[in-house]
Design a protein with these regions (language model features):
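Serine-hydrolase catalytic machinery in alpha/beta-hydrolase-like enzymes
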Residues: 1-42
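Gly/Ala-rich beta-loop-alpha elbow adjacent to hydrolase catalytic centers
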Residues: 41-53
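Short glycine-enriched nucleophile-adjacent loop
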Residues: 50-62, 68
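A short, hydrophobic beta-strand element of the alpha/beta-hydrolase
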Residues: 68-71, 132
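Acidic catalytic loop of the alpha/beta-hydrolase fold
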Residues: 76-77, 109-114, 136-138
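Short alpha-helix in the alpha/beta-hydrolase fold that links the catalytic acid
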Residues: 82-83, 114-124
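Short beta-strand/loop motif that positions the catalytic acidic residue
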Residues: 99, 103-107, 111
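Catalytic histidine-centered segment of alpha/beta-hydrolase-like enzymes
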Residues: 135-148
C-alpha cells in the first residue's frame, strides 16, 4: 500500500495484478476507461492503467486512439487471450477501431512492481516500440533523456 489509485481489487491471497486470474471490478474499470478515452487521439496508461489500456487496445474499444503509451505494464493475465488474439490477427483493429495505433512501451530494468519481461510480453502482442529508462516503476522524470525521447516519439506520431 503506497496509497495509490487502483482500477480493480485482487482476490484473497493475491498481491499483484499479474498474479491474479481475476481482477475484481475489471468490467467497470474497462467501461470507465473506454468512456474517458472516447475522442482521445493520445492515451497514456501507467501500471494498472497501462494494463487496462493494453486490453482496451486489443479489444478495439478506443476507436479514436492513434498514439498510445503504456508505462510500467504488467501482464494482464485475466485478459491474456485478448492480447494474444490481437497478435494472432496481425494487430488488425477490432470492435469500433478503424485505426491501428502507434504504441510505445516504456519499461525499466529497475521496475520492482511489474517485471520488465511482462511489459515486453505485452509489446510482443501489441507491437510498437520500446523505450527503456532507469527510473524503475515510474515514467521517466523531467530532465531524463528518456522523457525527452518519449515526448519526441509521441509528437512525431501525432503529427503524422
Amino acid at each position: 500500500g503506497g496509497g495509490g489509485f487502483a482500477w480493480w481489487a485482487f482476490p484473497p491471497g493475491v498481491s499483484r495484478s499479474y498474479e491474479a486470474d481475476e481482477w475484481l471490478g475489471a468490467g467497470a474499470a474497462l467501461d470507465a476507461a473506454a468512456e474517458a478515452g472516447r475522442g482521445c487521439e493520445f492515451c497514456l496508461g501507467f501500471s494498472q492503467g497501462a494494463m487496462l489500456l493494453a486490453v482496451l487496445l486489443a479489444r478495439g474499444r478506443l476507436p479514436d486512439c492513434r498514439v498510445a503509451v503504456l508505462a510500467g505494464a504488467g501482464w494482464p493475465r485475466p485478459f491474456a487471450e485478448d492480447l494474444r488474439s490481437y497478435r494472432d490477427r496481425g494487430g488488425r483493429p477490432v470492435g469500433g477501431s478503424l485505426v491501428q495505433p502507434a504504441v510505445l512501451h516504456v519499461t525499466s530494468e529497475q521496475d520492482r512492481i511489474n517485471p520488465r519481461e511482462q511489459a515486453l510480453e505485452v509489446h510482443r502482442c501489441l507491437g510498437g516500440d520500446v523505450l527503456e529508462h532507469a527510473a524503475g516503476h515510474a515514467l521517466p522524470p523531467d530532465g531524463d533523456p528518456a522523457a525527452a525521447a518519449l515526448a519526441r516519439w509521441a509528437a512525431l506520431r501525432l503529427a503524422a
